[in-house]
Amino acid sequence: TGMRIGEVCALRWEDVDFRQKVITISYTAGRIYNCESRTTERTFTSPKTRNSYREIPISRQLLFALKEVKKISPSRFVVGTSGRPEDPRSYRDFFARLLKRLNIPHIVFHGLRHTFATRCIESQCDYKTVSVILGHSNIATTLNLYVHPNLNQKQRCIERMSNFLKIK
Protein backbone atom coordinates (compact mmCIF):
# COMPACT_ATOMS: atom_id res chain seq x y z
CA THR A 1 0.00 0.00 0.00
CA GLY A 2 2.93 2.36 0.52
CA MET A 3 1.58 3.30 3.96
CA ARG A 4 3.84 4.75 6.63
CA ILE A 5 4.43 2.52 9.66
CA GLY A 6 2.45 4.87 11.91
CA GLU A 7 -0.48 4.69 9.49
CA VAL A 8 -0.33 0.89 9.47
CA CYS A 9 -0.30 0.79 13.28
CA ALA A 10 -3.22 3.23 13.55
CA LEU A 11 -5.38 1.54 10.90
CA ARG A 12 -8.79 0.61 12.29
CA TRP A 13 -11.13 -1.94 10.77
CA GLU A 14 -13.64 0.85 10.19
CA ASP A 15 -11.03 2.47 7.91
CA VAL A 16 -11.10 -0.59 5.64
CA ASP A 17 -14.01 -0.58 3.19
CA PHE A 18 -14.22 -4.15 1.91
CA ARG A 19 -17.07 -3.31 -0.46
CA GLN A 20 -15.38 -0.33 -2.14
CA LYS A 21 -11.93 -1.96 -1.74
CA VAL A 22 -10.40 1.15 -0.19
CA ILE A 23 -8.36 1.97 2.92
CA THR A 24 -8.91 5.44 4.39
CA ILE A 25 -5.94 7.00 6.14
CA SER A 26 -7.25 9.22 8.91
CA TYR A 27 -4.92 8.52 11.85
CA THR A 28 -1.31 7.79 12.61
CA ALA A 29 0.39 6.24 15.63
CA GLY A 30 3.73 7.43 16.90
CA ARG A 31 5.79 8.64 19.81
CA ILE A 32 6.51 12.11 21.10
CA TYR A 33 9.32 13.11 23.44
CA ASN A 34 8.31 14.46 26.86
CA CYS A 35 11.01 16.91 27.95
CA GLU A 36 9.98 16.86 31.62
CA SER A 37 10.08 13.10 32.11
CA ARG A 38 12.73 12.54 29.44
CA THR A 39 10.69 9.70 28.02
CA THR A 40 8.60 9.15 24.94
CA GLU A 41 4.84 8.83 25.02
CA ARG A 42 2.71 6.98 22.52
CA THR A 43 0.39 9.06 20.36
CA PHE A 44 -2.67 8.43 18.21
CA THR A 45 -3.31 11.54 16.14
CA SER A 46 -4.48 12.84 12.80
CA PRO A 47 -1.94 12.63 9.95
CA LYS A 48 0.77 15.26 9.69
CA THR A 49 -0.48 17.01 6.54
CA ARG A 50 -3.68 17.53 4.57
CA ASN A 51 -2.32 15.25 1.84
CA SER A 52 -1.72 12.48 4.35
CA TYR A 53 -5.50 12.10 4.65
CA ARG A 54 -6.22 9.86 1.69
CA GLU A 55 -7.87 6.80 0.25
CA ILE A 56 -5.73 3.91 -0.97
CA PRO A 57 -7.22 1.26 -3.26
CA ILE A 58 -6.82 -2.31 -1.99
CA SER A 59 -5.32 -4.95 -4.29
CA ARG A 60 -7.02 -8.35 -4.63
CA GLN A 61 -4.20 -10.00 -2.69
CA LEU A 62 -4.37 -7.55 0.19
CA LEU A 63 -8.18 -7.70 0.25
CA PHE A 64 -8.01 -11.48 0.69
CA ALA A 65 -5.36 -11.19 3.44
CA LEU A 66 -7.32 -8.50 5.31
CA LYS A 67 -10.50 -10.60 5.23
CA GLU A 68 -8.59 -13.56 6.69
CA VAL A 69 -7.06 -11.41 9.46
CA LYS A 70 -10.44 -9.84 10.28
CA LYS A 71 -11.92 -13.30 10.90
CA ILE A 72 -9.50 -13.89 13.78
CA SER A 73 -8.82 -10.34 15.00
CA PRO A 74 -10.24 -9.43 18.41
CA SER A 75 -9.03 -5.83 18.09
CA ARG A 76 -10.62 -2.77 16.52
CA PHE A 77 -7.20 -2.17 14.96
CA VAL A 78 -5.93 -4.12 11.97
CA VAL A 79 -2.48 -4.61 13.53
CA GLY A 80 -2.14 -5.97 17.05
CA THR A 81 -4.49 -7.53 19.56
CA SER A 82 -4.51 -5.09 22.47
CA GLY A 83 -7.47 -2.99 21.36
CA ARG A 84 -5.28 0.08 20.97
CA PRO A 85 -2.88 1.16 18.23
CA GLU A 86 0.29 -0.89 18.01
CA ASP A 87 3.45 1.00 18.95
CA PRO A 88 5.38 1.65 15.70
CA ARG A 89 8.68 0.91 17.43
CA SER A 90 7.39 -2.48 18.62
CA TYR A 91 5.92 -3.24 15.20
CA ARG A 92 9.22 -2.33 13.53
CA ASP A 93 11.00 -4.77 15.88
CA PHE A 94 8.40 -7.47 15.15
CA PHE A 95 8.90 -6.95 11.42
CA ALA A 96 12.69 -7.34 11.78
CA ARG A 97 12.28 -10.55 13.82
CA LEU A 98 9.80 -11.92 11.27
CA LEU A 99 12.21 -11.33 8.39
CA LYS A 100 14.98 -13.05 10.33
CA ARG A 101 12.78 -16.04 11.19
CA LEU A 102 11.80 -16.40 7.52
CA ASN A 103 15.43 -16.03 6.36
CA ILE A 104 14.57 -12.93 4.36
CA PRO A 105 17.35 -10.33 4.07
CA HIS A 106 16.92 -7.41 6.46
CA ILE A 107 15.09 -4.35 5.18
CA VAL A 108 13.88 -1.46 7.30
CA PHE A 109 10.09 -1.16 7.34
CA HIS A 110 10.24 2.21 5.59
CA GLY A 111 12.08 0.46 2.76
CA LEU A 112 8.76 -1.17 1.86
CA ARG A 113 7.41 2.30 1.09
CA HIS A 114 10.34 2.98 -1.26
CA THR A 115 9.89 -0.42 -2.91
CA PHE A 116 6.16 0.24 -3.36
CA ALA A 117 6.81 3.58 -5.08
CA THR A 118 9.52 2.13 -7.30
CA ARG A 119 7.39 -0.86 -8.34
CA CYS A 120 4.45 1.43 -9.10
CA ILE A 121 6.61 3.51 -11.43
CA GLU A 122 8.09 0.37 -13.01
CA SER A 123 4.51 -0.78 -13.65
CA GLN A 124 3.88 2.41 -15.64
CA CYS A 125 1.73 4.09 -12.97
CA ASP A 126 1.81 7.84 -13.45
CA TYR A 127 3.92 9.85 -11.02
CA LYS A 128 1.08 12.02 -9.75
CA THR A 129 -1.07 9.02 -8.79
CA VAL A 130 1.84 7.38 -6.96
CA SER A 131 2.51 10.65 -5.14
CA VAL A 132 -1.14 10.91 -4.05
CA ILE A 133 -1.22 7.27 -2.88
CA LEU A 134 1.90 7.92 -0.78
CA GLY A 135 0.31 11.04 0.71
CA HIS A 136 2.94 13.47 -0.54
CA SER A 137 2.05 17.13 -0.92
CA ASN A 138 4.65 17.56 -3.65
CA ILE A 139 5.38 15.17 -6.52
CA ALA A 140 9.07 16.11 -6.25
CA THR A 141 9.21 14.30 -2.89
CA THR A 142 8.02 11.12 -4.56
CA LEU A 143 10.49 11.39 -7.42
CA ASN A 144 13.52 12.53 -5.41
CA LEU A 145 13.20 10.30 -2.35
CA TYR A 146 11.14 7.26 -3.26
CA VAL A 147 11.67 6.29 -6.89
CA HIS A 148 14.85 4.34 -7.58
CA PRO A 149 15.34 3.39 -11.25
CA ASN A 150 17.17 0.10 -11.76
CA LEU A 151 19.63 -0.74 -14.53
CA ASN A 152 16.94 -2.35 -16.72
CA GLN A 153 14.83 0.79 -16.58
CA LYS A 154 17.81 2.93 -17.50
CA GLN A 155 18.66 0.59 -20.40
CA ARG A 156 15.05 0.70 -21.67
CA CYS A 157 15.17 4.49 -21.49
CA ILE A 158 18.32 4.61 -23.63
CA GLU A 159 16.82 2.10 -26.09
CA ARG A 160 13.63 4.16 -26.42
CA MET A 161 15.64 7.31 -26.98
CA SER A 162 17.82 5.54 -29.56
CA ASN A 163 14.76 4.17 -31.36
CA PHE A 164 13.18 7.60 -31.34
CA LEU A 165 16.31 9.10 -32.89
CA LYS A 166 16.68 6.08 -35.22
CA ILE A 167 20.15 5.30 -33.88
CA LYS A 168 21.30 1.72 -34.51
Regions found by a protein language model. Give the residues of each.
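Short, basic (Lys/Arg/His-rich) helix/loop patches that form interaction surfaces
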Residues: 1, 56, 64, 71-136
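Short, charged phosphate-coordinating catalytic segments
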Residues: 1-30, 128
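Residue-level signal for well-ordered alpha-helical positions
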Residues: 11, 68-69
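Short, polar N-cap/turn motifs at the start of nucleic acid-interacting alpha helices
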Residues: 15-22, 125-145
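C-terminal secondary-structure termini that scaffold catalytic or DNA-interacting sites
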Residues: 20, 31-53, 60-62, 81, ...
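Catalytic-site neighborhood detector that most strongly recognizes the C-terminal catalytic loop/helix
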Residues: 29, 134-160
